């Protein structure tokens, strides 16, 4: 039945059906059912009537509001039980605020830990931590252990939220910082809360000792159970205190606080095995009393905050299991230990590499934020002690040894030269701080932000070249044997190329490319970006050697003693070697894909609304803002990669042979690297089987088969193992 009211309905009757409303309300109602059906018959099948006043916004609002499938606030009306808040539950006697048994304490603590982790993984506080009624107002709790624990959890949430907000490396899918008006225990100091937890911890430790078995004494099963339960509660309270103390340590500006956090993390890790083995001692959740599998047990009400959620599609918060909780904490501790290592790094290049490697593990938002705030402390100094400008100068010295930064050079104390280099270094600070911050974002967002930061680095590149030219002119007047050509420019170009390479490679990790696109991505990397990178690294190495020779000559002039020449390890040699290996891997993959295409093993889409050129230009669009290296446009790419320019043009067997040589070359380069790391061994695990597969294909193996090959990216994120099906 479709009804129309002549007066606005009374808001109090929104939950009633139409017949009840008609009886209850004094409103004049008109039955329009027949008129509505007649109007519908005038419409043809599939035709819709669209009123000008009923746009997309109104349509979405009409669908969402008060529809249980769309409005999160309506879920509470669908359960048969009464949803009580903390005060109502206390009056009703459904929740204990004093004399909680050990199993109850253990169970509540474990579920709280699970809720805390679920919040850190991107759900709202209202659907996770604040489903625990004890957290709503710890002042009502009389049990000392429960009160201290509730305050501890609130403080952990508050400091974690502050850290994540300050680091600003989260997006809406990573983290939700809204507190929904709940008090975050701001009236109690951090020191007071850690003191309360320590008192409870000491009390439980005394109970653990008093129930311990003595030699030669027959063990009472009840006393043994009490001992195990006391130990379980003690481990959880101590873990809460240690975790809170670690987060407090990270709020301090001194570097010594990081060392303190490192020691505490070792303690926290030691407690996890005791927590894991005692999970069964806590009271368990009773499932089936609400929708989904949110734990229902004393002290928890999953629907208590449902009305606080905005009228949006209900986001289901699946609380993680207790066994997973222990594993998560174990990984979090390892990540925080890794974060602590950043303060020992000597220069900016090492720090950037560290951030890249840390980000590759896809760490949680809390550990990413802690790394950011440890690197750049509130006073905007690196680790709270070093100026970013000094870090940039050190990075320049270690990479290209520019004469202007050498104390033995005439430009070192030249005011004009000093102003030039200081101005350039100051302009470097913002882009490099942004680059470090980008590595704190999740992997998908990183790629997008890397594309945008190229514009800033392009501007920096332009400035570097101008400063180089000015310094070179000054230097020639005083020291004609020295050059200042392309020193700063080489350094900025190196970072530009790294960003471009990372941007393209991350597309493989995020599974953005279709198989038919692989060939031009690998071509751009091997023929262009890695070629430029190796040339840039070689130029930087040459600048270093030239500066070292001048320094040695100056030393000889002062000292008459003959010094034995030691063979120096070139600082950039390892990176040059790795770039050669990467270039060979990319070249091997490019030739493999071209050969597969020749053999009809690559399925191409039937382009209707786009074309290969449109896709190509979309993939490399961010590079258009960069002047050096100049972007390769689609027609240039087709011309440069055209095999018909060779006489005779190579066929697929020859391309398979060429690809196998590239994989073999990469394998030989990597096998000669001293002290290989995990990255080297991962690439070797791809290069070796691909070399064998290319040899088989070159010999005509499965030549007639048109079944596309499989590309297995499980060993390495950027280079797949080619598998023939």
UniProtKB/Swiss-Prot annotation:
Q: Which PANTHER family match?
A: GLUCOSE REPRESSIBLE PROTEIN MAK10 (PTHR21373), N-ALPHA-ACETYLTRANSFERASE 35, NATC AUXILIARY SUBUNIT (PTHR21373:SF0)
Map out region (Disordered) in residue numbers. 548-573
Q: Which UniProt keywords apply?
A: Cytoplasm, Phosphoprotein
Q: Which organism is it from?
A: Mus musculus
Oligomer and partners: Component of the N-terminal acetyltransferase C (NatC) complex, which is composed of NAA35, NAA38 and NAA30.
Q: What is this protein called?
A: N-alpha-acetyltransferase 35, NatC auxiliary subunit
Where are the Phosphoserine residues found in this chain? 187
What ranges does the record list as Basic residues composition bias? 558-571
- Whether Cytoplasm counts among this entry's keywords is yes
Q: What Pfam families does the record point to?
A: Mak10
Q: Where in the cell is it found?
A: Cytoplasm
- Quick one: a GO biological-process term for this protein? negative regulation of apoptotic process
Write out the function statement from the record: Auxillary component of the N-terminal acetyltransferase C (NatC) complex which catalyzes acetylation of N-terminal methionine residues. N-terminal acetylation protects proteins from ubiquitination and degradation by the N-end rule pathway. Involved in regulation of apoptosis and proliferation of smooth muscle cells.
The record's similarity note reads:
Belongs to the MAK10 family.
**One GO cellular component, as annotated:** NatC complex
Q: Give the residues annotated as coiled coil.
A: none
């Amino acid at each position: 039945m479709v009804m129309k009211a002549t007066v606005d309905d009374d808001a109090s009757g929104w939950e009633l059906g139409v017949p009840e409303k008609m009886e209850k309300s004094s409103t004049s109602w008109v039955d329009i059912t027949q008129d509505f059906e007649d109007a519908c018959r005038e419409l043809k099948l599939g035709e819709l009537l669209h009123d000008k006043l009923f746009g997309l916004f109104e349509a979405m609002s009409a669908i969402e509001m008060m529809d249980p499938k769309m409005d999160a606030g309506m879920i509470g009306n669908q359960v048969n039980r009464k949803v009580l808040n903390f005060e109502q539950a206390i009056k009703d006697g459904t929740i204990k605020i004093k004399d909680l048994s050990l199993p109850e304490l253990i169970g509540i603590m474990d579920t709280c830990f699970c809720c805390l982790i679920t919040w850190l993984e991107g759900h709202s506080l209202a659907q996770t931590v604040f489903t625990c009624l004890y957290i709503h107002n710890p002042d009502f709790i009389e049990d000392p252990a429960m009160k201290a624990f509730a305050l501890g959890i609130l403080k952990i949430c508050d400091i974690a939220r502050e850290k994540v907000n300050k680091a600003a490396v989260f997006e809406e899918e990573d983290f939700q910082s809204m507190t929904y008006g709940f008090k975050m225990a701001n009236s109690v100091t951090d020191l007071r809360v850690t003191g309360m937890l320590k008192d409870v911890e000491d009390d439980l430790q005394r109970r653990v000792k008093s129930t311990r078995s003595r030699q030669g004494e027959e063990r009472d099963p009840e006393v043994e159970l009490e001992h195990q339960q006391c130990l379980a509660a003690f481990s959880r309270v101590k873990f809460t205190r240690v975790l809170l103390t670690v987060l407090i340590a990270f709020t301090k500006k001194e570097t010594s606080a990081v060392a303190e956090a490192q020691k505490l993390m070792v303690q926290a890790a030691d407690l996890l095995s005791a927590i894991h083995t005692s999970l069964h001692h806590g009271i368990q959740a009773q499932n089936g009393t609400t929708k989904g599998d949110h734990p229902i047990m004393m002290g928890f009400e999953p629907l208590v905050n449902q009305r606080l959620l905005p009228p949006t599609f209900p986001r289901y918060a699946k609380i993680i299991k207790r066994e997973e909780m222990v594993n998560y904490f174990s990984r979090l501790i390892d990540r925080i230990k890794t974060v602590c290592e950043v303060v020992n790094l000597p220069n900016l290049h090492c720090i950037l590499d560290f951030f890249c490697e840390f980000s590759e593990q896809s760490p949680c938002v809390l550990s990413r934020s802690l790394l950011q705030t440890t690197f750049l402390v509130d006073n905007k100094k690196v680790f709270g002690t070093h100026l970013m400008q000094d870090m940039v100068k050190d990075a320049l010295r270690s990479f290209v040894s520019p004469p202007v930064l050498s104390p033995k050079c005439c430009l070192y104390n030249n005011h004009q030269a000093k102003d030039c280099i200081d101005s350039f270094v100051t302009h470097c600070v913002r882009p490099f701080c942004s680059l470090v911050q980008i590595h704190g974002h999740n992997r998908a967002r990183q790629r997008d932000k890397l594309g945008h930061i190229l514009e800033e680095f392009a501007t920096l590149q332009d400035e570097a070249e101008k400063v180089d030219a000015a310094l070179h002119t000054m230097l020639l007047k005083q020291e004609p044997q020295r050059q200042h050509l392309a020193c700063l420019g080489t350094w900025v170009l190196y970072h530009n190329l790294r960003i471009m390479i990372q941007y393209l490679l991350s597309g493989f990790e995020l599974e953005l490319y279709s198989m038919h696109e692989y060939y031009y991505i690998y071509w751009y990397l091997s023929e262009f970006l890695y070629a430029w990178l190796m040339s840039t690294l070689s130029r930087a190495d040459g600048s270093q050697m030239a500066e070292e020779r001048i320094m040695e000559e100056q030393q000889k002039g002062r000292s008459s003693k003959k010094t034995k020449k030691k063979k120096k390890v070139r600082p950039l040699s390892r990176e040059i070697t790795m770039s050669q290996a990467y270039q060979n891997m990319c070249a091997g993959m490019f030739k493999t894909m071209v050969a597969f295409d020749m053999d009809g093993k690559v399925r191409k889409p039937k382009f209707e609304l786009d074309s290969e050129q449109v896709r190509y230009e979309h993939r490399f669009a961010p590079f258009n803002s960069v002047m050096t290296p100049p972007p390769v446009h689609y027609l240039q790419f087709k011309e440069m990669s055209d095999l018909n320019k060779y006489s005779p043009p190579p066929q697929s067997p020859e391309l398979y042979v060429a690809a196998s040589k590239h994989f073999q070359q990469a394998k030989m380069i990597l096998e000669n690297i001293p002290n290989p790391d995990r990255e080297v061994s991962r690439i070797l695990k791809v290069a070796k089987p691909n070399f064998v597969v290319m040899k088989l294909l070159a010999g005509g193996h499965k030549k007639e088969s048109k079944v596309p090959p499989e590309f297995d990216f499980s060993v390495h994120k950027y280079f797949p193992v080619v598998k023939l099906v």
